[in-house]
């Protein structure tokens, strides 16, 4: 699991057109995630790079679970991962883009940041950009959302799709 650190997000509109992009997109199959994946395909169109589709499995209190319960949760995550991978493949299928599907576990914002930082480290000279959809849930206005957490702590350019 990754820790969130404070930093200032960069402006994605200032990325030169000849830069290879590594677009990290959080994906859970929700309408905001689908919009974010569509936006990522638009951002990558006509450029070199890839879309890194990230499903973050979040278990709030692993310490309170028995070993048997953890095995069941892992099976559920495997099923969800396969379902989301299939949905992403259908959405990205014949667009001629390079994309990869990854599953991570932990805090969603922290894991998206860690994925972006790690992917850029693996591809020196490329630019990592996180693309996420914004949530319209009323509870997120009070408690915060993934997009808000990313906006506060993201060390790479960030695109929040309405």
What are the functions of these language-model segments?
Residues 156-162:
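Short, flexible loop segments at boundaries between secondary-structure elements
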Residues 13-67, 71:
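Small/aliphatic-rich secondary-structure junction motif
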């Amino acid at each position: 699991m990754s820790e969130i650190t404070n930093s200032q997000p960069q402006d994605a509109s200032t990325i030169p057109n000849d830069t290879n992009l590594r677009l990290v997109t959080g994906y859970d199959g929700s309408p905001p995630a689908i919009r974010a994946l569509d936006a990522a395909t638009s951002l990558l169109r006509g450029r070199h790079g890839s879309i890194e589709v990230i499903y973050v499995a979040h278990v709030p209190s692993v310490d309170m679970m028995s070993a048997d319960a953890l095995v069941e949760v892992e099976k559920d995550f495997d099923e969800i991962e396969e379902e989301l991978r299939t949905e992403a493949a259908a959405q990205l299928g014949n667009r001629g883009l390079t994309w990869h599907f990854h599953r991570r576990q932990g805090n969603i914002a922290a894991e998206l940041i860690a994925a972006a930082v790690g992917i850029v480290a693996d591809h020196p000279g490329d630019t990592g950009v996180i693309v996420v959809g914004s949530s319209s849930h009323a509870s997120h206005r009070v408690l915060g959302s993934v997009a808000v957490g990313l906006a506060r702590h993201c060390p790479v350019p960030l695109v929040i799709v309405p």
